[in-house]
Regions:
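Conserved phosphate-donor/acceptor-positioning beta-strand/loop module used by diverse small-molecule
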Residues: 119-139
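Glycine-rich phosphate-binding loop used to anchor ATP phosphates in small-molecule kinases
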Residues: 77-119, 123
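Hydrophobic anchor at the beta1->P-loop junction of P-loop NTPases
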Residues: 32
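Small-molecule kinase domains that catalyze NTP-dependent phosphoryl transfer to phosphate-bearing small molecules
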Residues: 145-187, 194
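Conserved glycine(s) of the Walker
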Residues: 39
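Conserved substrate/cofactor phosphate-moiety recognition/catalytic segment
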Residues: 42-93
């Protein structure tokens, strides 16, 4: 039996999704990974301009479940149990999804691979990166109050997390958001259409 907390949390997140796209026979799950400030949310927003996908942005979803997030391991564990449950339920309904989260550990990504494999969903993996100088400027602008989305991460968080990045062991796209992202967007749109 599933944890009632997970189901309750996933329901709260579902209520905030708004209008859902039309279901498809074989939905796609696009998992976007990368350190804070590398441009994951920007990349996801550009992708969503071209694909009618639901974006599940972990930073925004965290703030739905926790009004004053602490980013503790316990909080993150609860958040991602709810996100994984939500992904599973939406894929079962034929909803195409983009998961926008750091997704730095292969063990955590394995859970997503298993969900996609079990539900026969197409899985597309994307590693987003940018040079440390570009990331520093983006995070500095974020800390100075420039509108940068839902993330609270700063340069210190980036520095701490960069040592936890694990290689993606499956085929994936790599995109440097300090350069033109159009070629990778084009490839992903084509892959979704196949």
């Amino acid at each position: 039996m599933e944890d009632t907390q997970v189901i309750s949390d996933a329901q709260r997140l579902t209520e905030k999704l708004g209008q859902l796209p039309e279901p498809v026979v074989k939905p796609t799950l696009i998992v976007v990974s990368g350190l804070p400030g590398t441009g994951k949310s920007y990349f996801c927003s550009k992708l969503a301009e071209r694909l009618l996908f639901i974006i599940l942005e972990s930073d925004a979803l965290r703030k739905i479940l926790f009004s004053s997030p602490t980013y503790s391991l316990q909080e993150s564990s609860r958040l991602f149990r709810a996100i994984h449950h939500l992904i599973e339920e939406l894929l079962k309904k034929g909803m195409p999804l983009i998961l926008d989260a750091t997704n730095l550990s292969e063990r955590n990504r394995e859970r997503l691979y298993n969900i996609a494999d079990r539900l026969n969903a197409k899985l597309i993996l994307v590693r987003v990166e940018a040079s440390p100088g570009v990331v520093y400027e983006r995070l500095k602008a974020r800390s100075e109050g420039m509108p940068q989305g839902n993330s609270d991460a700063d340069w210190a968080v980036f520095q701490r997390m960069k040592h936890t990045v694990q290689k993606i062991r499956r085929n994936h796209y790599a995109v440097d958001t300090s350069r033109d992202i159009t070629p990778v967007l084009d490839k992903i749109v084509r892959e979704v259409s196949r």
